[in-house]
């Protein structure tokens, strides 16, 4: 293998051009080029000279120099050699699909990417990005109306123009979609994009019904299914006949309803419920059980208390048995009487987009919910077909999808990489936020792990005291005996900003004492992790502000 330092590349497209130029040289079997590392690795016959390689790079306007030494990542070029010449079909264009497409090209494959709707998938278009923009706007409105500093900063009733907020939101969505999805695909000559709906013909070919009309058959060596998921609709009589909202419609509404009913008790339902409440809606949440009923009970209790303090009505153990829409008004029949609202948001989960794929043709196994069953390498029951993201039985987070897509591409081109989710962080963007990683106590006990735990309320965290906002807690779960940290649950303003430290601690198998011994910057929320760790053998109320 020959390794070359390449100076002058400014983007991934530059790396693609260098790769193409090198692989056009007779005798070059494969090349891997990395723009961030300013490096090319070339596997070639002995007849290929260094001067030939450097000349091909120079012809593109870049400067190359041969690197001398032992190279430890030779498997990367070996993978590319196996991937060279492969044709990979990818169904979808979201986080998993994009990560897989770019990695597959890097590994030497050519890619046909098929998208039936808008390029970019859920996250950038109708999920993470627009919802977080709306949540941020609602947070600003809330602070203008009410803050811990109202005694010295006069509170005001904000004048909210939802149409202008929506225009700002969608402009950023369009900008990110073009910069991170459309522009990247357009600039990569190894990726062909088809706009249409794909279904399997067999385990080596797809039929694509093109949006512009007609059909096209696409053959492949390997295929990745990354079709995502859509809002699930519960079987409530009358619901489908009514103009209810899912998160998709709620995020693009240009008005704020006076009364909003929300069916759901987890992430999407609660994030949007609070956002609409802060923008002016009177919100009522119908929870079949309690809020966040799958998590540690303290999480749901803390968020419920915070919501009720803001005037959001939370009806626990309440289900709608009938939905009607009469004279522009929703009427929900519940066990506690009728509930009336101007709009109804249904956010009870998401269902995988797999029904139209004809997965039975290649014999791909799905579970009872229609999610594709995969192993840690994203392999399905058919060796030619892989899957990643929300259409599978993995956790539905875009960063999990992207990591899965990358590993799927490596495995489709001859590698062997697994996705390890033992220290997977999760964040809910309510206020206070909810952030978790690893085991809850109940989950650990279910797996036969004996635990010890401590819960630190935020009135013991200097940053929270300085903010005059002590809502929430940080809970650490450790393995009894070893003292190893195995789980963290946090409810706190900006809890999402502290959880990654806990991820690294768990990933590196730190004990709670090792965590307590680390240096944490004073007056940061993440310092709460150190204080929580100290509670296993100290009373932190008796410590000075920044006691080590």
From Swiss-Prot:
One of its GO terms (biological process) is detoxification of mercury ion. It catalyses: Hg + NADP(+) + H(+) = Hg(2+) + NADPH. It comes from the Bacteria. Binds 1 FAD per subunit. Keywords: Disulfide bond, FAD, Flavoprotein, Mercuric resistance, Mercury, Metal-binding, NADP, Oxidoreductase, Plasmid, Redox-active center. The keyword Hydrolase does not apply. Its cofactor is FAD. It is an enzyme of class 1 (oxidoreductase). Its EC number is 1.16.1.1. Hg(2+) binds at residues 545-546. Disulfide bonds join 123-128. GO terms for molecular function: flavin adenine dinucleotide binding; mercury (II) reductase (NADP+) activity; mercury ion binding; NAD(P)H dehydrogenase (quinone) activity; NADP binding; oxidoreductase activity, acting on a sulfur group of donors, NAD(P) as acceptor. A metal cation binds at residues 11, 14. Residues 1-65 form the HMA domain. FAD binds at residues 97, 117, 122, 132, 198, 390, 398. Homodimer. Belongs to the class-I pyridine nucleotide-disulfide oxidoreductase family. The active site is a redox-active disulfide bond. Resistance to Hg(2+) in bacteria appears to be governed by a specialized system which includes mercuric reductase. MerA protein is responsible for volatilizing mercury as Hg(0). This is Mercuric reductase. The lineage of its organism: Bacteria, Pseudomonadati, Pseudomonadota, Gammaproteobacteria, Pseudomonadales. The gene is merA.
